[in-house]
Amino acid sequence: MKSKLKVYIGLFLGIIFLSACSPDIVDISLYTTDVEVALEGEIVEVPVKASFTTYSDDEDGDLEKATIIAEKYLSPDSIFSQSSGDWGETLVIETTIPLGTEESLRSYLGSNNRVAVLLVEVDEKENIDVSVRPTDFAAALDSELSDINFMLGFSLPADDTNFRVISDSRNDVEVSATAVFVSEKPYLYFEKILKKRGEAEIVFKGSTDSVYSEIYPVIYIYFP
């Protein structure tokens, strides 16, 4: 059995699970002021929309069982919907994942189950790194899904991780990334200055022949 996952923010890591261990697509919409707030120690819940497709009929009701399990590892207001198509079953999840510093996320995860987070860090050049990271709950979810069906599971990174960075800051913001695609064009290094209300859509390819199959996608943000 083969399956695909598509996650949109605007969505997840996502973010989440199905017959394939890695999601196909994770779309994340990130506002620059949310990053600024997170740097001050607050947690910001980032909305995620994830869709998973299995290329077979779900005769045993595994998707419904997986949904019940996944609810334990997602925000309480997550919305699940399932539909059937010509190629199999599709499960859509609308949820959120937390954005924050390592310290604030550690505290948050002490009382909240989430399979993925957006980690904010400041490097030695004063650039702000934002990366998608799985948590210990991701491994727990993967294990429980495997108990239902050995073809079920969850892991990161996704085949494609799509960061949509939107500037709502008063001043210009610089966003950059390494080895990415923008408007379907490959870039060894991508950089863009965002005016207020400007945006950049950056895609990380995480397929098996890509470096991002082994490391977590990260974008760099600089507030001049």
Indicate where each model-derived feature is located.
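C-terminal motif of bacterial Sec signal peptides marking the signal peptidase cleavage site
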Residues: 17-20
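Bacterial signal peptide processing site
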Residues: 22-24
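Post-signal peptide N-terminal segment of mature Sec-exported envelope proteins
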Residues: 29-50
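N-terminal, post-signal-peptide region of Sec/Tat-exported proteins
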Residues: 50-75
